[in-house]
Amino acid sequence: MRFGPVPPRAAVGAILAHSEDLGDRRLRKGKRLTEEDTAALAAAGRRQVVVARLEPGDLHEDTAADRLAAAICGDGIAPQGPSATGRVNLRAAGPGVLVADSARVGALNRVDPMLTLATLPPFRRLAASEMVGTVKVISYGVAADSVARAEAAGQGALRLARPVLATATLIETRVGPDTPPDKGRRAMRARLAALGLSLSPRVVVAHDTDAVAEALAAAQGELVLILTASATSDIHDTAPEGLRRAGGTVAQFGMPVDPGNLLFLGAVSGRPVIGLPGCARSPALNGADWVLDRVACGLPVGPEEIAAMGLGGLLKESPARGRPRAD
């Protein structure tokens, strides 16, 4: 691509690099100039105009952006096209979790500085039609060879992991005779609804190992959540022991995400079980969101995945927290 100033009469067929205000009309940057346009520029006293002119083997920015967007989009991600000014936004076809291949995204962005892809962070919960990324071709034209290499590098880099579960049961425990406020249940219902999961009728039991075990055995949801009246402080505390007594297993206790440290993860009768930290009573983002989203969408969540959550795991502190970090 050639770029630079030329006399207006020499700019026919070139791409205008900067918008020009001619009084009675405005020529927007990116416009392919016609004879009428260049005559108007000359009549307005412009001696030179900055343009871009594609050379053999170059692709226009919009063509390049459309091709890249089509290559990047995997299952459940679609380009919102066609391109305008070298940009195509990518959107989710439904609720779920963004699965991004960081190696492919990086490889695409290293092909040519003029070819770029920006995305949301991997594993972000998505709503239907939410923007997950944007392709931007920075220059007005780019070598077709670079576009082909970027297409190959970024092939299928983004996809949507859709929910694979439809129902959940939340088991709450109480200390004493009083039923706990429904703040935690409301927060969890909203999280589940964002992924299309429904919550079964309320279950509140005594904060006791046997009571938790019985509730687990009776739970109807494909996913079981436990929110205890007293925080789980050890892998052998009330809720994890209740899970074992129900015939289940505990795969993980604790996570390097704050708020959210006191989460545990296990299974019973082939169903995932998440022991929620107290911060899950707040709608604010916490570590339980990251685990819940992946579990609901059928993505692996084990010790390796949870350990990796520590990078970026210092989240905004919940206003509901009893003891702030600074204390």
Briefly describe each language-model feature range.
Residues 43-47, 70-77, 128-131, 137, ...:
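Generic secondary-structure signature for well-ordered alpha-helical cores
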Residues 138-224:
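Phosphate-binding glycine-rich loops and their immediate beta-loop-alpha structural context
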Residues 55-163:
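Extended, charged alpha/beta regions that create polyanion-binding interfaces
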Residues 28, 34, 121-128, 258:
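Residue-level recognition of short, solvent-exposed, well-ordered loop/turn junctions
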Residues 1-85:
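Short, low-complexity N-terminal leaders and the immediately following helix N-cap/first helix
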